[in-house]
Structure formats: C-alpha cells, structure tokens
UniProtKB/Swiss-Prot annotation:
Highest rank taxon of the organism: Bacteria
UniProt entry tagged with the keyword Kinase: no
Cofactor: Mn(2+)
Protein name: D-fructose 1,6-bisphosphatase class 2/sedoheptulose 1,7-bisphosphatase
One Pfam family this sequence matches: FBPase_glpX
A single BP term in Gene Ontology: gluconeogenesis
Highest classification ranks of the organism: Bacteria, Bacillati, Cyanobacteriota, Cyanophyceae, Synechococcales
Entries under SUPFAM superfamilies matching the protein: Carbohydrate phosphatase
Described purpose of this protein according to its UniProt entry: Catalyzes the hydrolysis of fructose 1,6-bisphosphate (Fru 1,6-P2) and sedoheptulose 1,7-bisphosphate (Sed 1,7-P2) to fructose 6-phosphate and sedoheptulose 7-phosphate, respectively.
Keywords: Calvin cycle, Carbohydrate metabolism, Hydrolase, Manganese, Metal-binding
Organism per entry: Synechocystis sp. (strain ATCC 27184 / PCC 6803 / Kazusa)
Amino acid sequence: MDSTLGLEIIEVVEQAAIASAKWMGKGEKNTADQVAVEAMRERMNKIHMRGRIVIGEGERDDAPMLYIGEEVGICTREDAKSFCNPDELVEIDIAVDPCEGTNLVAYGQNGSMAVLAISEKGGLFAAPDFYMKKLAAPPAAKGHVDIDKSATENLKILSDCLNRSIEELVVVVMDRPRHKELIQEIRNAGARVRLISDGDVSAAISCAFSGTNIHALMGIGAAPEGVISAAAMRCLGGHFQGQLIYDPEVVKTGLIGESREGNLERLASMGIKNPDQVYNCEELACGETVLFAACGITPGTLMEGVRFFHGGVRTQSLVISSQSSTARFVDTVHMKESPKVIQLH
C-alpha cells in the first residue's frame, strides 16, 4: 500500500470526528452517527483506491451505516479506467466505526472516537454482527494471558508480566448485567475495575500504551469492534483474543438472533467452520500490511476531543502501521476562515 495512505486515512477519521462533534451533547445519537458516516464516506471517495467495506456499523440499532460490501474510493467510479491503472491498483478491505460510542457523543461523555482499519483484500476478518468475548493486554503479556483462563489466573500472569502487584492493575469492563460475575471475580482477585458504558475499542488500544493506567480489557462486546481493536493491537504488538458469542442466553438479549441454532447456521453460511474458535489479532487482522487510524470526538484516554474555536477546529488523531514501530499522534488545526486563525491552546 502507498505510504501516503496513512495521511489520507487520518483525514478520513478527522472529518468524521468533526462532523459528529457538532452534535455532542444534543441527545441525538443517530444524527451524530449519520453525519460521521456521511463525512467518512465523502472523504474516502476522494482517495485513489478501490476499497470495500468488510466491517460496517449500525446494523444493531438500525442506524445509518457504511454497509458491508459497499465500495469506496476514486477507483470504484464508472469512469475509473481513465485514471486508475489496474496493474498498479491495490484492492483494500476496510473496517469502520465512524462514531464509536454514539451514546457518549449524544450525552457529552468522554471516550468516543472515529476509527477505521485497512488492509489489502482478505486482510481483515469479516466478522458477523454478533457479540465477541474479548481479552486485551499490553505487549509484555502477549502470548502469556489467555482468554480460556479465568480472570483470576490472567491477573496473576499479568501481574508477573508487568512486574506489578495485582492491586495495582486496572481492568476495563463494559458496564452490563452480563458482566456481574466477572466484575466480582476481578475485585475478589484484588485488581481494580474501571466500568465503561460504551467504547471498548479505545479501552483495548489503551492497554498497549504505558501511562494510561489501563492494563487489560475483559468481557463481551461487539464483534465488529473486536476486529478493529485487533487491527490496532496487531500494529502495536499488544495481546488481543476474541471468541464469537452465538448463544443469545450468554448476553441475555435478542440482538444476535432469536436462537442458538439459527446463529450457528448463519455462521456456517459465512464459512466459519468452528464457531468456538479463539482468534488472535494476527488472525483477525492477517494482512501483510495493516493500518489503523482514530480521531477523538470527545476527550479520551489517548486523545483529546474535537475543539472548536473562532475560525477553525482542532483535532487529535492516532495512526499506526504494522510495517513500522511507530504510533503517530497528530495534532491538527483546521483553519476555516480568512484571515487564517491558529489557536494553540
């Protein structure tokens, strides 16, 4: 993939974040999502690529979405043959969440961001809109903790890997009734729990950075966001495992289908032969090159949110690549009026 693509996808998430941030605190989560989708689609369609959405968003709550299978990029146009050389063109798979944490935006809460991951065709796992059991941990614990182990066992391993006492560890868990026993087990083991209402992509990624005071993500969340988290952790060298949840009784909702049997049939129709398989980040994001980008909508652990000022907007983004050992935080001032105004603080 072209090295300039990293800069292009930063602009994609920036535009989505800016559009969504205008609806921060207005209680309109679907509108905040809709404008982010439209802004993301518009910017992606200006990139010299043939992209295909393999992880979309919005299916669970019938919100607007960049639908699975949608093609984006200049080279998907009908007249593309005149300016896109097929011999030089790389087909790209894209996983998106234009507004990760729609409720967070709607109610003015921290932790929402616009995110996407890209790889060459076939490089990202096309996860169904199911739930996924997840385990994320820092690079030092990669291959040592395991999703099949209990939370208590993993905390002991994590303590050894990080050279910290269990009491110093902080585990992020989504605040859901299904996690009642998990939360109690973590607390009984001596670790601390940080409950979040939404936005587990940010929590997963934060495990890979020192100084965030987040040492693990545990529990069940959405599978599509699991693939995006895995792409980021693949780039960062962190630990991520995911296992699809196909039994509605596990999460006590009907959001993943009416029956266990029906869900198993759906997975089989998608070519998933072992529904109980545990995937690591190299399997969920298996491409030779994986790029991840995010832009804060509201303030979060890693990035500031969008800040509006007279004459412009300021954003903070993150871009990482599996091909390099760098995580670039990009602070951008978008000047909107003349004379140009740059606000530094």
